[in-house]
Regions:
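Charge-rich, low-complexity N-terminal segments
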Residues: 1-113
Length: 113
């Protein structure tokens, strides 16, 4: 267990609004497209602080923030196994959405990335 912890939160204020559906949830309304305003909290731990007395240098997290924005900022998140995946790409070709594929969608699956 780490001795020092630090957290970084990317909240609703940076515009992480995405839409997705659960293609395997044919028993509920979750198989329909629905949108979320997303937020992410990352916790970092270390046994020894760096020379600035930090557990993590937040300045080094710019690539993480960019990945979050590229993946979730007004994006249509599609499960790679969604049987209707091509239809989302048809919408993207018409400039009606921006598709990002994931190996599973939902809060739990997004946390795995």
């Amino acid at each position: 267990m780490a001795k020092h912890y630090s957290t970084k939160h990317y909240g609703h204020n940076i515009g992480l609004s995405a839409v997705f559906r659960q293609p395997n949830a044919d028993h509920s309304h979750c198989h329909l497209l629905h949108g979320y305003s997303l937020a992410f909290t990352f916790t970092f731990g270390c046994d020894a602080l760096d020379n600035k007395n930090w557990a993590v240098d937040f300045g080094g997290l710019k690539p993480l923030k960019k990945w979050l924005e590229d993946s979730f900022d007004h994006k249509t998140c599609v499960d790679i196994n969604d049987p209707h995946k091509q239809e989302f790409y048809t919408l993207q070709e018409k400039d009606l959405c921006e598709v990002v594929e994931f190996d599973g969608v939902g809060a739990e699956k997004f946390a795995e990335h």
